[in-house]
A protein has these predicted regions:
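C-terminal catalytic/acceptor-binding lobe
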Residues: 1-11, 16, 33-37, 176-178, ...
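Hydrophobic targeting segments
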Residues: 19-25, 41, 47-50
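Short, well-formed alpha-helical segments that are part of the catalytic scaffolds
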Residues: 27-43
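Acidic ATP/Mg2+-coordinating residue in the GHKL
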Residues: 52-54
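Active-site-proximal specificity loops/subdomain of glycosyltransferases
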Residues: 59-96
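Active-site acidic short loop of glycosyltransferases
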Residues: 98-101, 126
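Short beta-strand-to-loop acidic/aromatic patch adjacent to the donor-nucleotide binding site
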Residues: 100-111
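Conserved catalytic core of nucleotide-sugar-dependent glycosyltransferases
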Residues: 113-200
Length: 258
């Protein structure tokens, strides 16, 4: 079976219904990575918005290049402009979507597998649930180029029954000591009928995603075992290095964001 050039309408939804997928990405100081990931991810969405600050002109330029709506806001920096209010930015992005189907919050450095909609079609998605996925850490421009040349990247799903790992390290899952599994912010999929909003002010990029996930009871927070995303990193860096603003190197020093 050839899983090439999937159109958004080909994905399945809850109980086999057609799936309508909208997405929101918050991108502040990550235009170099967004330029790469948008090119890989756009075909999976029926609608997608990117939220950034008014000052981040590089992100706005990337959105224009990919013909993606860009929503600038002051809220991304917080009231006193001394924080990264990612939750407020996500809420603003969600306000630009219809919520008539499924919603996916995705980080700017995440690439979805090219068989993503096919894999969603193999899941009995329940509108009452929040779904997370795993990520494979791809460190550096050279590793990314090498990965794209492999058959595993072109088609994770092989023989109609096997999900293949590309051999890259698996990113950590969050298993909370009191609350159990929590889908974290790089990939959170939920149905628009849930009418959930992000915590408004946690001061950085971490924590708000966990608080958001805890709006669903434990049995309703689920991992999609058939979805392996790619987490692009410019360099090996400690966890949280960019949670309060970009500190890591640009992704691919020879690349320019116009």
């Amino acid at each position: 079976m050839d899983y090439t050039a999937l159109r958004p309408s080909s994905g399945g939804g809850s109980h086999g219904a057609p799936l309508f997928l909208e997405g929101v990405i918050v991108c502040w100081q990550f235009a170099d990575l967004l330029d790469v990931t948008l090119g890989e991810n756009l075909g999976h969405f029926d609608d997608l918005v990117v939220v950034t600050s008014h000052e981040d002109r590089q992100t706005a330029a990337v959105c224009r290049r990919h013909s993606v709506p860009c929503v600038p806001t002051d809220a991304i920096r917080g009231r006193w402009r001394d924080a990264f209010n990612k939750g407020a930015a996500i809420n603003i992005g969600l306000g630009h979507l219809s919520h008539r189907g499924w919603l996916l919050h995705l980080d700017a450095d995440i690439v979805l597998p090219d068989c993503f909609r096919t894999m969603l079609a193999k899941e009995w998605l329940e509108p009452e649930c929040l779904y997370g996925a795993d990520r494979l850490n791809v460190v550096g421009w050279d590793q990314w180029q090498k990965l794209k040349a492999t058959a595993v990247y072109r088609r994770q799903f092989q023989y109609r029954c096997l999900v293949q790992n590309s051999g890259h390290p698996l990113g950590a899952r969050l298993i909370h000591g009191e609350y159990g599994y929590c889908p974290i912010g790089f990939f959170q999929l939920w149905h628009g009928s849930a009418r959930r909003r992000y915590p408004h002010n946690c001061g950085a990029a971490e924590h708000s995603d966990v608080v958001f996930a805890l709006q669903w009871p434990g049995p309703k927070r689920r991992l999609l075992p058939q979805v392996l995303t790619y987490h692009l990193q410019s360099e090996a860096a400690p966890m949280g290095v960019d949670w309060r603003g970009r500190k890591s190197m640009p992704f691919g020093s020879s690349r320019k964001t116009r």
